[in-house]
Regions:
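AlphaC helix of the eukaryotic protein kinase fold
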Residues: 47-69
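A short, aromatic-enriched beta-strand patch in the conserved N-lobe beta-sheet
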Residues: 80-82
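Activation segment signature within eukaryotic-like protein kinase domains
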Residues: 117-118
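Protein kinase catalytic-loop region centered on the HRD/HxD motif
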Residues: 121-133
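Conserved short submotifs of the Hanks-type protein kinase catalytic core
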Residues: 86-99, 103
Length: 299
């Protein structure tokens, strides 16, 4: 199937269109130059054909959530949001220079980098969870890299408040990084399922594939879902990945949510311990804003 052409970039007061950055199923991302302050920004714009009251509400929810959380250094910074003159909602964010969506399959990512990224994204999740917010779509493709080389969590498009969320409402999911209970539709998400997804994401950065992909086998969503429910993750298969790190990731991907780390903070600390055991500098907790307090978030 051929990819669709990007939509027409909207005319926005105070912004000058530069070029297309990317396209997705629901919208496009464009590079604009903002006039005041003068800087380049990324503007995510919904496609006109998908805009309806429900989608508009979800998009506004994403804007609100990200504006509240984006003061965290590992969450994509949001500058403003609005509706264009032709009725398309848009979100203005910082520009990122890369991400892990394609890179994890194309390159061998160093262990130290995978650990740093896992710790920083765990810190972002901890902040979201304390605000009673679940992301619901943690995967390599939703981790971007800023111009300063820092990983940031993006795309809270299907996130929701834990207390306001409706567990009976189905949401989109990325099967390779979805926890067993989400696959079974026992829940649309929880702190425990987010830890599973983050463990699966760190695994993917190291292995170059998602945890239940089997080289040479049928890795369609249906077969992956079956393995997620019944099988153990494939070994990472790298001699430079210590056994302790595989143990930490397998624990995070336990079938039973109770057996996983009890918070993103606990998972981050386990990754930090692996850093220490490898003689690596421990990722600075101050830069990730981790501490020992916990929000009362549903598991």
């Amino acid at each position: 199937m051929s990819r669709r052409l990007p939509s027409t970039p909207p005319v926005l007061s105070g912004f000058t269109f530069v070029r297309v950055l990317g396209s997705g199923g629901f919208g496009d991302v464009f590079l604009y130059e903002q006039q005041l302050p003068r800087r380049n920004v990324a503007i995510k714009v919904l496609l006109p054909e998908v805009v309806n009251p429900r989608v508009r509400d979800m998009f506004q929810s994403e804007a609100q959530l990200m504006s509240q959380l984006s003061t965290h250094p590992s969450i994509l910074s949001v500058f403003e949001a609005g509706v264009s003159s032709d009725g398309r909602p848009y979100l203005v964010t910082e520009v990122c220079v890369g991400g892990y969506g394609e890179r994890f399959r194309a390159e061998t990512i160093p262990v130290a980098e995978a650990l740093r990224t896992g710790i920083r994204i765990a810190a972002a999740l901890e902040t979201a969870h304390r605000a009673n917010v679940l992301h619901r779509d943690i995967k390599p493709g939703n981790i971007l890299v800023t111009a300063y080389g820092h990983p940031v969590l993006s795309d809270f498009g299907i996130a929701s408040s834990v207390y306001l969320g409706d567990n009976s409402t189905a949401v989109g999911l990325s099967v390779p990084w979805s926890a067993p209970e989400v696959i079974r539709e026992s829940t649309t998400g929880s702190t425990a399922s987010e830890i599973w997804s983050l463990g699966a994401t760190v695994y993917s950065l190291l292995a170059g594939r998602s945890p239940f992909e089997v080289p040479g086998k049928d890795n369609s969503p249906g077969h992956l879902a079956g393995r997620i429910l019944k099988s153990k993750p494939q070994p990472i298969g790298r001699s430079d990945v210590p056994a302790r790190l595989e143990e930490v990731l397998n624990k995070a991907m336990s079938k039973n949510p109770i057996d996983r780390p009890h918070s993103a903070l606990e998972f981050a600390r386990q990754l930090q311990q692996v850093e220490t055991s490898l003689g690596l500098p421990q990722t600075d907790r101050k830069s990730t804003r981790l501490n020992s307090s916990h929000a009362n978030v549903s598991r």
